[in-house]
Amino acid sequence: LHLSIVQRCASRLGLQALWVLVGLASSTLVSAAGALPTYGEMDAAGFAGSPRENYALQDFSDKYRATLDISAKDDVFRPGVINVYDKASGAALIRVQSDELVLGTDPKTGKVKTNVHELPYGEQSVLIYQDFNFDGIKDLALMDGQNSCYHGPSYQVFLGTAHGFRHSDSFTKLAQNNCGLFSVNEKARKIETMTKDGCCWHQTSTYSIRNGEPVLETQTVLDHTGGSGLPTETVSRNQNGKMTHTTSIVWEEDQQREILLSFRLAPSGKRIVLFRSGDASPVFYAAVDSKNQVGLLFPQADGEQLKYDAASHVLSFVRGDTAYRIVGDAKGAPSAMQVVVRGKTTELKLLAEPAKGSLNKVADALKAAQ
């Protein structure tokens, strides 16, 4: 009898212990499931111990609202936290923190501005609410600091769903690795990005949306680092999942570029231009077509050189087995152009229009560059 009572008591105690363990496990699961996802990096301890200001963001949605908790220091970039809430339930949905947020408020309401998106270098607000993947549900971009080009604004991107938001690594990558947030072309249903490196290297990319994700379609790189100052344009295109690349040199009008001589060939209208980019700088020859593509640029390689014979009024240069000659009169006006390939000469006619500049100006510039 005593043993039976002891067994029943032990059984009850074991059952109670089991329920306690189950309760603890259930509590842990609920807590984990309900944990607020936090994105971005910051000195949380320093932020917690510093004076802060709290702002409501401008009303941007019927379903959601947001706040900005930011350092009270009067700095351009300040530590802060953006929180997004469900309006109906009051539940916190997303938290983004950063050591470098910006405070831009509406002077009339005092609320933090939203949906300001002035590309490429203008103001961009801490929250942008727009349909990025063209599925009919608006998405969120929340500033997470100044991680894009030239210490510009960067964003964490959350795609809207029927039940809230989900973080998107692919869209976030586009909002981190370029100059600010991407632009949205709703009519073309495309996403466009831009980035640069100094004055002389620019890259623009266009993405289509497939299955809700961005897919690179075209990418154009303009590189002005060549000695002539003319940009090399490399265009990459997605051809059935494989990127193809074409490279060309592009003629651009530039106020710093001095045109020494310019004339057109007949009947194509192709422009022949001799130019330099400043006093004592090298002289370059460019053959430019109607689409401003440069078919021939000279010099490019080491050892290549333009030569002018004052006695015969001829400017010439050689590339490979081909020699090019521009023949002028005593006043420096071009009268003919010749292309000589392995001893065979082809005469190129000029359009019957006045040339701009002269061979004499080219000759003077060549002397100045020596």
Task: Give the residues covered by each predicted segment.
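Bacterial N-terminal signal peptides
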Residues: 14-28
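A low-complexity, Ser/Thr/Gly/Pro-enriched, surface-exposed linker/loop concept
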Residues: 101-111, 282-312
